[in-house]
Amino acid sequence: MRNRKMKVIFFGTPLFAAQVLEFLLQNQVEVVAVISKPDRPKGRSSIPVPTPVKLIAQSYHLPLYQPEVVSSLDFAPVLKNYEADLFVVVAYGEIIKQHLLDMPKRACINLHASLLPKYRGAAPIQRSIIEGEKETGVTIMHMVKKMDAGDMIKKVSVQITSEMTYGELEQALCQIGKHALLEVIKQFDRGEPSRQIQDSHLATFAPKIELEDCELDWNQSAQHLHDLVRGVNPYPGAWCYVKVNGEQKRLKISRTRVIPYPSNCPGTILDSSKGNLKILTGDQALELVEVQLEGKKTMTSEQWIRGMSKNQLKFLVN
């Protein structure tokens, strides 16, 4: 082990990154500066909200920077003055250009929430669930100009259970990811970690989830719809259009269950005298365990339809 600790500049923005940063600090990693995205308004408020990474940096009294464009030439001298050994990037939220990737003395490394080369891109956790994967993980890699294509240093896998949501999987990946990242930083402190080239022929991509991606199409299979609901819970949330007493409204669906049942009329409400709503899909039925009608609180679908007759409610099919 060298006498001088390696100097690290940490780049990150959301809660996932904040938890990783705090873990590194608790384990005596010398973080000399923190870079996070600018504060933005959240929800209906116009007041900017501090990023989770900013809050951790402030609580540890670390130098904090929130440039509008991190790769701007004006900001480069600020980073260069720290003479950092490592740049560590975790869910920062912006592409980092080559002149910054070349700046640290040792490397610029990234914690990516998939088993690369699968699910390169902005939404690897959500996409892995939506695609019905049974396994995913984290990869610590060298950063290069091409997105998520650098040499891999360490990979750790985790199982995706049948009911696991995006939020739950994110926490599981954070736990294994922060330990893997700390181990890699220690490897750099001892020398040069081994690296493995990615096979680009095996690469798949995980583009950002848009709101329209989250609309349920009842013509699709029940399993696919169930996976979509899990993959966007809690954010941005799966949804569909319904008509309640003839008025069209948006229904958010956060928990479901696949029900074996022959289906030939997608979007039809399955006759049931009690319990949660069950909707026919392209192949089976989907039980709506937890729903939220626009303007209302989250509840079970049984609670939502209590006192409502079947002809008062209709699910709209694309």
From Swiss-Prot:
First-tier enzyme category under EC: transferase
Keyword Disulfide bond: no
Pfam families: Formyl_trans_C (PF02911), Formyl_trans_N (PF00551)
Positions bound to (6S)-5,6,7,8-tetrahydrofolate: S114, L115, L116, P117
One Gene Ontology MF term: methionyl-tRNA formyltransferase activity
Alphabetical list of CDD domains matching this protein: FMT_core_Met-tRNA-FMT_N (cd08646), Met_tRNA_FMT_C (cd08704)
Keywords from the named record: Protein biosynthesis, Transferase
Reactions catalysed according to its record: L-methionyl-tRNA(fMet) + (6R)-10-formyltetrahydrofolate = N-formyl-L-methionyl-tRNA(fMet) + (6S)-5,6,7,8-tetrahydrofolate + H(+)
Entry annotated with the keyword Transferase: yes
One Gene Ontology cellular component: cytosol
Gene3D superfamilies documented for this protein: Formyl transferase, C-terminal domain, Formyl transferase, N-terminal domain
Documented EC number(s): 2.1.2.9
Family statement drawn from the similarity comment of this UniProt entry: Belongs to the Fmt family.
Described function: Attaches a formyl group to the free amino group of methionyl-tRNA(fMet). The formyl group appears to play a dual role in the initiator identity of N-formylmethionyl-tRNA by promoting its recognition by IF2 and preventing the misappropriation of this tRNA by the elongation apparatus.
Protein's UniProt name: Methionyl-tRNA formyltransferase
Species of provenance: Protochlamydia amoebophila (strain UWE25)
